[in-house]
């Protein structure tokens, strides 16, 4: 039966069913290496989704046959602890399990030239193990990426104070955490399909969105009580924005399109499209690491299947006709990515820089979040960049930080580095369900195409998540190791 592969049996061998001949062990190894090499030659870094937190078998697993009970945590009555929800959880806090994990990731990094690791249910691992993994990978290549889910599936035998939870990110420098704060703030809870978020009508989630915009770092303009009341964190958890993996959707739970349909079953397709654009316009203009679910740029649907781990290709495949049908959404996402790459102001990481150079605009209508990036933030060519997210169903007149000739590069229909229009003055009318980006950049020639900026821009981190595979684009990385 098809399964994403979250039932590990042998951690150090590629899955054979993806090879041309699964019955010959060397074929899967050779072809996996060839795949990684080809991706590197195309300028694409490869991140593995690793599931060290549990095994497919429990009592009969290889680990349990070596030393019964040692590699798994137990409950007080002697049973197997099940913080993974899959029947068991491995004991990373025991020295030989920790050693196995370190040996395994360093093997993948050196033998297969893997560029990063995404840890499933990372909070089932202890803080010390995660820090040792980060240290071992840094010795191999400091640019290797490590991030994961800063939560578990409930009921772990590991002491909470020892677990690699999101709230303890400050104790794990160099390790990123998925931000469910901005995820559910934007679109609503993943555990309640009908619950909306900011873009689909729950405007009281605006503070949670703002918290995500500063990359979960401390900022004087964030009301953390309101963040918590909206179901988010009770305080900042990231010491730098690079620790915050900002996303709206991934392979788990509903696709963004399906979530929007579930919350607004009577909405017309054009309104859903606007929300689909705005959701990731928030992500791609926020501080932190943007993460996009593969297919979100073409309105991917799984027909409402929120847990498709064992569903067929009919559900999980990408239908490339979606791209033709939703070319406008695709181009919009592409333009936002170009904008982010061209402007380092969107890529600050230090908390102090974000505090000093990102100012939220106040006295604005409910349902609108707006901020200004100022002081040529992070060495940007633009002295000011103003971002406005209007999630309401009506036009909103928004005052700009100053009276100037503002270059509009993003509105509800178009996004990119080219100037759409020059807005003269100190206010702008923002259309419903739309995100706008305006800037003051003397280096921009408003009569020419600005795609050439991509040639000189620093690379931004962008994660494209498929079902269980992750690809990272980074122009600074060499084509292959």
What are these regions (language model features)?
Residues 92, 118-121, 234-235, 260-273, ...:
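Active-site rim elements
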Residues 11, 39, 108, 119, ...:
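Conserved, mostly hydrophobic/aromatic
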Residues 36, 105-109, 134, 245-248, ...:
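Non-transmembrane alpha-helical segments in soluble domains
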